C-alpha cells in the first residue's frame, strides 16, 4: 500500500509518499517563511493562496522522486485539522479531488496525531505505551498514549503555547522572523548567571502549563534593561534569550517528570516544532537517563510540519479500513481525544 500525504495546516506545504514495505519513499516541503517575514507572523490569506500555488507541483515532484505514477497510489491522506481554515481547505479540496479522479480512498488526518506519531518514522521507534509532550507554536500538551488513537490528555497550556511564547519574546527582542529558532541560537551566547525567569505553574500540583506570564516577565525585563542601557546590546539580548529559554525548558521538564510519575511509564516522546530545540532535547535526555527511561523524538526535518507524518498516519488508518466521506470538510478545532482507536 502506498499513501500520498498532504500537509497544509499553516505555513508549510508538505507532500510525501509512504510505502508499506519500503517506508518513506518521497518527501517534499516548501516553507513560506520568506512570504510572511515582512509581517512578523503568518497571514492566513497569503498562506492559503501560496498553498494553492505550491501543492500540485509538490505532488508531481513527490511522484517523480519516488519513481511512481498516479496509478501507483493506493490512498490519499490530508491534514483535516486543527489549523487555519483556509489553508486546510486547500489541502482537503486537492486531496478529495484527486481521490475522486483516481478512484481511491482518502482520509482526513489530525495534524497533532501526525506530530505525535512522527517518531515512528525513525529506525528505533517507541513502543506503546508512552507519555508524549506535544510542543509547537499552537499547542503544548502532555498526552498519555496507550496505542494509536488511544489518547488521554493529561495537561495542556491554559493560554499561550510554548512555541508562541518563544516567537512573541523574540519579537520583543527585535529578532528576525521566525523568532523562536533565532532566539534559541542567540541563547547559546547568553550568560547563565545574569537573569532568572520564573518556572510558571510548577509550584502547584497538576500538569497544565501557562506561558503568557513568562512572556510578560520577559517584556518587563527588556524594558528594565533598556532604561539602564539606553538600548539593548547584543549580549543583553542573548542573556535574556538564555534565561527565557531555560525557564521554558525547565518548566516542560518538570511537568514531563510529573506525568511519567503519574502514569508509571518509562518512555517519553517529544514532538512538534519546538521539539527541535537543542536545549530541550538535552534536558529531557538527561532527565530520562536519571529516571532510567527512554526518550524519543523525530529527526529535525520531521519536527516541523511535513507531509511524511500525515502520509504515515493516513497509512495506519486506511489500512484498517477507515476513510473519510467524499464531502470536503475541515476541522480548524479538533480534540485528539475524539479520534478512533485502531
Curated annotation (Swiss-Prot):
Reaction catalysed by this enzyme: L-threonylcarbamoyladenylate + adenosine(37) in tRNA = N(6)-L-threonylcarbamoyladenosine(37) in tRNA + AMP + H(+)
Cofactor annotation: Fe(2+)
Cited InterPro entries: ATPase_NBD, Gcp-like_dom, KAE1/TsaD, TsaD
Ranges annotated as spanning the membrane: none
GO molecular function: iron ion binding; N(6)-L-threonylcarbamoyladenine synthase activity
Broadest EC class assigned to this enzyme: transferase
Entry keyword set: Acyltransferase, Cytoplasm, Iron, Metal-binding, Transferase, tRNA processing
EC number(s) recorded for this UniProt protein: 2.3.1.234
Binding, substrate: 134-138, 167, 180, 277
Annotated cofactor note: Binds 1 Fe(2+) ion per subunit.
A GO-annotated cellular component: cytoplasm
Entry keyword Transmembrane: no
An individual GO BP term: tRNA threonylcarbamoyladenosine modification
Location in or out of the cell: Cytoplasm
Database matches in NCBIfam families: gcp_kae1, T6A_TsaD_YgjD
Family named by the database record: Belongs to the KAE1 / TsaD family.
Protein name, entry field: tRNA N6-adenosine threonylcarbamoyltransferase
Organism name: Histophilus somni (strain 2336) (Haemophilus somnus)
Taxonomic lineage from the root: Bacteria, Pseudomonadati, Pseudomonadota, Gammaproteobacteria, Pasteurellales
Gene name of this polypeptide: tsaD
Amino acid at each position: 500500500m502506498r499513501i500520498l500525504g498532504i500537509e497544509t495546516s499553516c505555513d508549510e506545504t508538505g507532500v510525501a509518499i509512504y510505502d508499506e514495505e519500503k517506508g518513506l519513499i518521497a518527501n517534499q516541503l516548501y516553507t513560506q517563511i520568506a512570504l510572511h517575514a515582512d509581517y512578523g507572523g503568518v497571514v492566513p490569506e497569503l498562506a492559503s493562496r501560496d498553498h494553492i500555488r505550491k501543492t500540485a507541483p509538490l505532488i508531481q515532484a513527490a511522484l517523480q522522486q519516488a519513481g511512481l505514477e498516479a496509478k501507483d497510489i493506493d490512498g490519499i491522506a490530508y491534514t483535516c485539522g486543527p489549523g487555519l481554515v483556509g489553508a486546510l481547505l486547500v489541502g482537503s479540496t486537492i486531496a478529495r479531488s484527486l481521490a475522486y479522479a483516481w478512484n481511491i480512498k482518502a482520509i482526513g488526518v489530525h495534524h497533532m496525531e501526525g506530530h505525535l506519531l512522527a517518531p515512528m518514522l525513525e529506525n528505533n521507534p517507541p513502543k506503546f505505551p508512552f507519555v508524549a509532550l506535544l510542543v509547537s507554536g499552537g499547542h503544548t500538551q502532555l498526552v498519555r498514549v496507550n496505542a494509536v488513537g488511544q489518547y488521554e490528555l493529561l495537561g495542556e497550556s491554559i493560554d499561550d503555547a510554548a512555541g508562541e511564547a518563544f516567537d512573541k519574546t523574540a519579537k520583543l527582542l527585535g529578532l528576525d522572523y521566525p523568532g523562536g529558532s533565532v532566539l534559541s541560537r542567540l541563547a547559546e551566547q547568553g550568560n547563565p548567571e545574569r537573569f532568572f525567569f520564573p518556572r510558571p505553574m510548577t509550584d502547584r500540583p497538576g500538569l497544565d502549563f501557562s506561558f503568557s506570564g513568562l512572556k510578560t516577565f520577559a517584556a518587563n525585563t527588556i524594558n528594565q534593561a533598556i532604561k539602564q542601557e539606553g538600548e539593548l546590546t547584543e549580549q543583553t539580548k542573548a542573556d535574556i534569550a538564555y534565561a527565557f529559554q531555560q525557564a521554558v525548558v525547565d518548566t516542560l521538564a518538570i511537568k514531563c517528570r510529573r506525568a511519567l510519575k503519574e502514569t508509571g511509564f518509562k518512555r517519553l516522546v517529544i514532538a512538534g516544532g519546538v521539539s527541535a530545540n537543542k536545549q530541550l532535547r538535552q534536558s529531557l535526555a538527561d532527565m530520562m537517563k536519571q529516571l532510567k527511561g527512554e526518550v524519543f523524538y523525530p529527526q529535525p526535518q520531521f519536527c516541523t510540519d511535513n507531509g511524511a507524518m500525515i502520509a504515515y498516519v493516513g497509512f495506519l488508518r486506511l489500512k484498517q479500513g477507515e476513510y473519510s466521506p467524499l464531502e470536503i470538510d475541515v476541522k480548524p478545532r479538533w480534540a485528539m481525544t475524539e479520534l478512533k482507536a485502531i
